[in-house]
Amino acid sequence: MENSHINESILSEEILEDQKKNRIDHMTYLPGMEDIGSDVMDQVISAMNAYDYEKYTEVDVRRAIAHDIRTPEDFAALLSPAALPLLEEIAQAAQAETRKHFGNSVYMFTPIYIANYCENYCIYCGFNCHNKINRAQLNEEEIEKEMAAIAKTGLQEILILTGESRSKSTVEYIGNACKIARKYFKVIGLEIYPVNSDEYAFLHECGADYVTVFQETYNSDKYETLHLAGHKRIFPYRVNAQERAVKGGMRGVGFGALLGLDDFRKDAFATGYHAYLLQRKYPHAEIAFSCPRLRPIINNDRINPMDVHEPQLLQVVCAYRLFMPFASITVSTRECARVRDNLVNIAATKISAGVSTGIGSHVDDIEDKGDDQFEISDERSVDEVYDALLKNNLQPVMSDYIYV
């Protein structure tokens, strides 16, 4: 799938030509990037390239549904087109698996965007370095104000996000944000640019519990056409980020492809298989999935997940649940309230609330506010999401961790 609408640039031809002349090899590590010598990426890419989802039949899908423990081959069948007519049965099996391992619990959190400076040129992202948006970075006093305001809502888990700029959002800056967060929250996640294992160790010491890294797409050729400049262009460094995070002591790692960038079935398969391999290699690591679809961004409203409709999204979420029954699954505010409520009733176990993707959006007295990364569809407050969960006979959980 080409998705030519994604490749329509918002830049001038002159800038594009300059970028092309100076483009670096996306498969070669840059100086300072840690190579951990892992073979996980090669296994994932090999399996994804061999994945022919058209070969699976209804018999294969029913066999996968019936199994108590699903193999990668079962996972492949559950993601195939042959599974769509059986989506109701798959959803019922996924719901049963969710209740078995999580009961009615749904974990609540919110993201906090502390900076939106970025050094990458990813043509589908609102933060990309050539997009003319308002840039901002919170100082420590502003971070504390934002976090104090969020904590008053009752939330006990926070996800700290920055744009991917090492020069603006240094590892030390992010570490200080983690230390501030530890005053207010029991669980702290990070969604930042990938770093080396010793830097993940430093951030863990500062209070971070888990790291989420979106690979966006596992098709390295497509990846190269979407990430034209910056450190994010280096494909293998990003693929191996979760393993470096585990080596650095992080308790959990999250995986996600941006569904709609490329062939979503292959990307979903690669995402699940990547997590599966790391779970087998590091049994102690907590695994999480996020399932975002493309959304329009500032200055480019043509970006949409053209072939990933709600049934396909449900199929992916349920396949993750059946393949990795203990994994946490988050559904983004990129989805509307109805879709999110349905998914947490079936297979998702984590939901964000009171979300803003802008900088300094939780308090009124921060003057230098930055623009949003993407458009959100579910703008409900913490109380509204909490009440919606209760109405669906689900139990909102703020945290299940106690630090001693």
Identify the meaning behind each predicted range.
Residues M1-A83, R280-V404:
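Auxiliary Fe-S-binding modules of radical SAM enzymes
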Residues I69-V106:
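An N-cap/entry alpha-helix motif that binds or orients negatively charged groups
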Residues A94, C122, I160, V213, ...:
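Conserved, mostly hydrophobic/aromatic
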Residues Q95, T110, M147, I174-C178, ...:
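Generic structural signal for well-ordered alpha-helices
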Residues F102-G103, Y107-E142:
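Canonical Radical SAM [4Fe-4S] cluster-binding loop centered on the CxxxCxxC motif
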Residues N116, E164-S169, L259-F264, I298, ...:
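Short, small-residue-enriched loops and turns at beta-alpha junctions
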Residues C129-E144, I150-V246, R251-F255, L259-L261, ...:
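Core AdoMet radical
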Residues N196-E205, D262-Y276, C336-I346:
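Catalytic cores of alpha/beta
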